Amino acid sequence: MSEEEAQKMLYQLQMLETYVADMSQRESALVGVMKEAAAAVSAVKGIGEKGESEVLVPLGLGTFAKSKVSSGEKIVINIGAGAAVEKDKDAALSYLESRIKEIEIALRDTSAKRQEAAANLEHGKAHLDQMMGQHSHSTSGNV
């Protein structure tokens, strides 16, 4: 293996390492979103179970206000791009559950890509080690 080939392979392995790290970060972010979505579903399900529920409304910077929510109230859902819609409890749950399914698909896809890249990275490292070992044996015999 020439020095140029070794450098090229090393560069490719570094790119794969970066990609694997990026996929790991995406996985972590998606897991966080999944937890938040599950908490939202749980909270929406709990609204109105006992008639009127007391909740904390976030005001920003870790500041909250107590409020009461009745079972008949609409739930406001952010649908992206700064837009929000009002939905009844069942429609809100349906929307949240569909979003969870989308997140699960994205998480599976990201995980599969990370695993494939990690396997390619390990294979590439082993191949590089093997080639470097063969190169050192051939050069030590020429001394």
UniProtKB/Swiss-Prot annotation:
GO terms for biological process: protein folding. The keyword Disulfide bond does not apply. It is found in: Cytoplasm. One of its GO terms (molecular function) is unfolded protein binding. Belongs to the prefoldin alpha subunit family. Heterohexamer of two alpha and four beta subunits. Molecular chaperone capable of stabilizing a range of proteins. Seems to fulfill an ATP-independent, HSP70-like function in archaeal de novo protein folding. This is Prefoldin subunit alpha. It comes from Cenarchaeum symbiosum (strain A). The lineage of its organism: Archaea, Nitrososphaerota, Candidatus Cenarchaeales, Candidatus Cenarchaeaceae, Candidatus Cenarchaeum.
